[in-house]
Amino acid sequence: MKPSGLIVSVQAPEGSPMRDPDVIAAMADASLRNGASGVRLESPEHIGAVRQRCPTALIVGLWKRSYPDSSVYITPGWEEIRAVWAAGADVVAIDATERYRPGGENLEGLIARAQRELGAELMADVDSVANGLRAAELGCTWVGTTLFGYTESTSGQKPPAWDLLPLLRQQLPAEVSLICEGGISSAQQ
């Protein structure tokens, strides 16, 4: 599956009155009806609600979960990958940085298991060229600059990751989709 066009992130933080599956599904539906080529959704519950309302939508799914022993929070482990896929995501977004994962799980093992047991297509949320290339080598078919500016090693930098994009595009295999994500705040960008 190749993305084309704008994929709209339809998410609401914990505690927000907008964090309701019906509200998220309505916002996703409105985005798709107004030209979005897909939506990026957080949590199995929201993914399921959008899949039910918009059965043909391209859904990039993730699950943000915090663990005390790790700074990885975007679909950090097998339990989250499995739940996001089961909820109806077409592509599962995972943190593909080299940071320590909860419970000692490792990126290579998670990617291999997701492909073997689920046949899931994976989007690597990365913060650097090295992490993007590594994720593609491990089997991720989408790479996004999602975590640029949000990890310990990139915390001083501000998204969007304009400098990262050409380097990734030059070095990633042509069949790997590259997504600019984060910090885009205007139509001109």
Residue ranges and their predicted role:
Residues 1-18:
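N-terminal amphipathic alpha-helix/helix-capping segment at the start of soluble metabolic enzymes
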Residues 7, 38-40, 91-94, 123, ...:
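Conserved beta-strand positions in the central sheet of alpha/beta enzyme cores
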Residues 21-25, 73-79, 105-111, 129, ...:
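Charged helix-capping and loop-helix junction motifs
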Residues 24, 69-87, 127-141, 174, ...:
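Catalytic cores of alpha/beta
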Residues 35, 54-59, 86-91, 116-119, ...:
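Glycine-enriched alpha-helix->loop->beta-strand junction motifs that scaffold or abut catalytic
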Residues 50-52, 56-105:
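Glycine/small-residue-rich loop that forms an oxyanion/phosphate-binding "nest" at active or ligand-binding sites
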Residues 90-102, 136-166:
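Glycine/Thr-rich beta-alpha phosphate-binding loop at enzyme active sites
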Residues 101-117, 158-189:
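Active-site/ligand-binding-proximal alpha/beta "capping" segment
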